[in-house]
From Swiss-Prot:
The keyword Acetylation does not apply. Homodimer. Part of the ribosomal stalk of the 50S ribosomal subunit. Forms a multimeric L10(L12)X complex, where L10 forms an elongated spine to which 2 to 4 L12 dimers bind in a sequential fashion. Binds GTP-bound translation factors. GO terms for cellular component: cytosolic large ribosomal subunit. It holds the Pfam family Ribosomal_L12_N. Forms part of the ribosomal stalk which helps the ribosome interact with GTP-bound translation factors. Is thus essential for accurate translation. It comes from Albidiferax ferrireducens (strain ATCC BAA-621 / DSM 15236 / T118). This is Large ribosomal subunit protein bL12. GO terms for molecular function: mRNA binding; structural constituent of ribosome. Belongs to the bacterial ribosomal protein bL12 family. GO terms for biological process: translation. The keyword ATP-binding does not apply. Keywords: Ribonucleoprotein, Ribosomal protein.
Length: 123
């Protein structure tokens, strides 16, 4: 079986976050591994602390604003939820729309919400 790494990476690049999540779960089940990060043992002595840049962000919907229907559509597009679930999320604001996503994905989701007329922020 020929393996084309570039084709594989292209396929991964075209997948949605939900599809990638399903892929990770399938790989964990198939090979009996976990995608959880391994923690390194504590270092002894005086080691300078390195300030780490935040890599995971939450997109928080603060309120729907005047354009509630547009915000519900944006939430559905971002999360893949059904109409009722998206409406419940918007009605229950403040709510996390996306959790633990990369900065690029979080900024894209935030832009969609703001463009729809919602008040939202990154945490």
């Amino acid at each position: 079986m020929a393996f084309d790494k570039d084709a594989f990476l292209t396929a991964l690049d075209s997948m949605t976050v939900m599809e990638l999540n399903d892929l990770v779960k399938a790989i964990e089940e198939k090979f009996g591994v976990s995608a959880a990060a391994m923690s390194a043992p504590a270092a002894g002595g005086a080691v300078a602390a390195v300030a780490e840049e935040k890599t995971e962000f939450n997109v928080v919907l603060l309120e729907a604003g005047a354009a509630k229907v547009s915000v519900i559509k944006a939430v559905r597009e971002i999360t893949g939820l059904g109409l009722k679930e998206a409406k419940d999320m918007v009605d229950g604001a403040p709510k996390n729309v996306k959790e633990g996503v990369s900065k690029v994905d979080a900024e894209a989701a935030l832009k969609k919400l703001l463009d729809a007329g919602a008040k939202a922020e990154l945490k």
